[in-house]
């Protein structure tokens, strides 16, 4: 729930959130189903081949059913009458054999010293790379073909973490990703009762683990070694790390130069161009839905100063948009602002595409007063 002063005070003062807020207020914020949601990480990762060559990538999951949303009135009714709709819809589809599927794809970028692509900082999590500039290359398919047998054990206890990576995928210096590498681990230790959450069946790797972790809450292994450190001469040097020729992952060395500061680079200071790109990419219907969402949410705020501040944010993206929302709120138009240059990305619109009917419920409406032949 974001229709309150706290949220709009925050995003109005943290304008780097503008692009994200436009996505939230758009039709994508009220998906028709979990089966019709796109999945993509906001971070850039580094892929490494056997020769030690690196490439930067962004991961995408494209739903086979396409990307679809509810309309506002439908979302209000569904949320009030059937708030568990999304989870039940997903479970029902799996149970019926209409297995939800997503195509896994990657956007691939050269791993340059600047870590930029077409003027876009690949380490800035508030920005995306338009698919027209870097097409998504499909490399696999994700299929959900089984419901949990025990929801608590198999879902509630899952410990997701961006640092859980397979050999060949490494992190970048995206500052938000680096923060998440710490915070996710810290959260799982708190949420799942201690440092041994990785021993829970749903989190346990297929291969046995032999490491130096000992004791702690909910420890399930009976360790008998007396030297949980390395190197040691008491346990024959065990445990030892897996060598490279046995599949161990090794970080690729990278040169570093410059000054270490607590400031973001200048490329991070562009807070509005991608929000404008997103807005220009929408159809007129989608734009109208976005305007109505901004008007509804800001209309629930009590502090007029917060509303006026965010109208100024909108003016940095599109003056007509800002003035329309201001009219809906009964507030004066914000001052004209300089808006950034931006071109639409057709891939960001949900409309204008055709998709299969598989796994959908179909309703047939019949008017008894009309001749059907």
Question: Where in the sequence are the language-model features?
Answer:
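Active-site-adjacent core segments of small-molecule enzymes
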Residues: 1-372
């Amino acid at each position: 729930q974001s229709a309150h002063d706290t949220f709009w005070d925050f995003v109005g003062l943290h304008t780097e959130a503008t692009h994200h807020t436009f996505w939230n207020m758009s039709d994508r914020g009220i998906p028709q189903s979990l089966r019709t949601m796109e999945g993509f990480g906001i971070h850039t990762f580094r892929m490494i081949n056997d020769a030690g060559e690196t490439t930067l990538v962004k991961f995408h999951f494209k739903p086979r059913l396409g990307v679809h949303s509810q309309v506002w009135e439908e979302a209000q009714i569904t949320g009030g009458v059937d708030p568990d709709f999304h989870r039940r819809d997903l479970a029902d589809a799996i149970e019926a054999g209409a297995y939800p599927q997503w195509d896994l794809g990657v956007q691939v970028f050269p791993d340059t010293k600047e870590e930029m692509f077409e003027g876009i900082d690949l380490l800035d999590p508030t920005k995306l790379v338009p698919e027209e500039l870097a097409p998504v290359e499909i490399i696999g398919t994700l299929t959900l073909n089984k419901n949990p047998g025990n929801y608590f054990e198999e879902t509630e206890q899952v410990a997701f973490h961006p640092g859980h990576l397979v050999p060949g995928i490494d992190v970048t210096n995206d500052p938000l990703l680096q923060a998440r590498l710490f915070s996710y681990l810290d959260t799982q230790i708190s949420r799942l009762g201690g440092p041994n959450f990785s021993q829970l069946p749903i989190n346990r790797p297929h291969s046995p683990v032999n490491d130096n972790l000992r004791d702690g809450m909910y420890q399930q292994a009976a360790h008998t070694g007396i030297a949980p450190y390395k190197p040691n001469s008491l346990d024959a040097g065990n445990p030892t790390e897996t060598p490279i020729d046995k599949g161990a992952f090794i970080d690729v060395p990278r040169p570093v130069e410059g000054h270490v500061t607590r400031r973001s680079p200048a490329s991070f200071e562009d807070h509005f161009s991608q929000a404008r790109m997103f807005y220009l990419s929408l159809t007129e219907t989608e734009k109208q839905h976005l305007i109505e969402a901004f008007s509804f949410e800001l209309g629930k705020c009590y502090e007029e100063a917060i509303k006026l501040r965010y109208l100024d944010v909108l003016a940095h993206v599109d003056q007509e948009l800002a003035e329309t929302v201001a009219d809906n709120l009964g507030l004066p138009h914000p001052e004209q602002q300089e808006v950034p240059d931006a071109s639409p990305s057709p891939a960001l619109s949900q409309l204008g595409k055709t998709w299969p009917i598989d796994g959908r419920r179909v309703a047939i409406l019949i008017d008894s007063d009309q001749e059907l032949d």
